[in-house]
Amino acid sequence: MFDISFLFIGINSILTLLGCFINLFLCYLAIFQSPKAIRTYSLVLINITLTNVGACVTGFLLDQRIIQSGKSMLYVSYGYCSLLGEGFCFNIFAAYLHFHTHALWLLFLSFVYRYYVIIRQEPTKKVLQISVVIVYIPSLIQLISMCLQEMNFDELRSLSKEVVPQYNLTGLTITGSLDFFTFAPFYCLVHMAIISFLIAIGIHILRKMIINRMVLNGVDVTIRSRNLHAQLLRTLSFKATVPIIYYFGCIFFILGRIWINPIFEFSIFVPTVIVPVLTPLSAFIHVAPYRDFVSKMFHGRPKNKTVNSICIIPIISH
């Protein structure tokens, strides 16, 4: 009989390795190929790519599923973190979750930055760096609280035999939480689901406000800068759909509470490995300097684009 775990392990491995490569490449472009008009913003982009790399590396090390029973959650790891024991696997899991929440906060900061540039002026690099640190605080609290969480690994393994006696989990690393209403797992759950939902709403509100400002009032920048800002907005508009992908994971999480099924248990993590692959692709497609660099790599010359002042309206209206 086919073991479904091999399918999900393969999906996880391919997507996380692909995500590492794509994000490292975009990080290189953001550092060395960003035009002056978006060089300050590239600081946020660099942080996003490095956060995505962290999510991909930890995801590759985990290869995890979640088994739920009442107030308890069991995390079963199939990845290389198992070589260093349960404690290491759990800390990797804590890092994995905090990378994803921080990436969402950085996405929110991206929209705040674009709106601020339109209504005032571009902030200094120092202000932007401080902003990145501030939005990291909620995810840092989540990481520290989870790493300091105490757990009895023998008790968790015994619980797994009671909850899912039909599963053969011999030799696998089992961590988790006996009561997710304790501070660390509950804070993580609220941060991943409720606060992330509010961030997603804020992102879509900001996107609409940015479009209204640019279309109705115009932007006091040069023609070339207007085009670059419009391209960035197309990128951010694509990224605004990213939080929706996370909620497929929430759906599988809820289904996993109702039915004990390995497909639901593995599928909780599939959306979280898809997101770091999709988010950088938008920059390759919509930001002309990056797109031209990639086109030149593969075709020997960039695609010719006509830049003019009227192209901004159709670009931001999609």
Curated annotation (Swiss-Prot):
Identify the keywords attached in UniProt to this record, alphabetized.
Answer: Membrane, Transmembrane, Transmembrane helix
Give compartment(s): Membrane
Single GO cellular component term: membrane
Instruction: Report any Pfam family annotated for this entry.
Output: 7TM_GPCR_Srd
Coarsely, its chief localization is membrane
InterPro entries associated with the record: 7TM_GPCR_serpentine_rcpt_Srd (IPR019421), Nematode_rcpt-like_delta (IPR050920)
Transmembrane domains' residue ranges: 6-26, 42-62, 92-112, 127-147, 186-206, 236-256, 258-278
Q: Which family does it belong to?
A: Belongs to the nematode receptor-like protein srd family.
Query: What name does this protein carry?
Result: Serpentine receptor class delta-7
What is the organism of origin for this protein? Caenorhabditis elegans
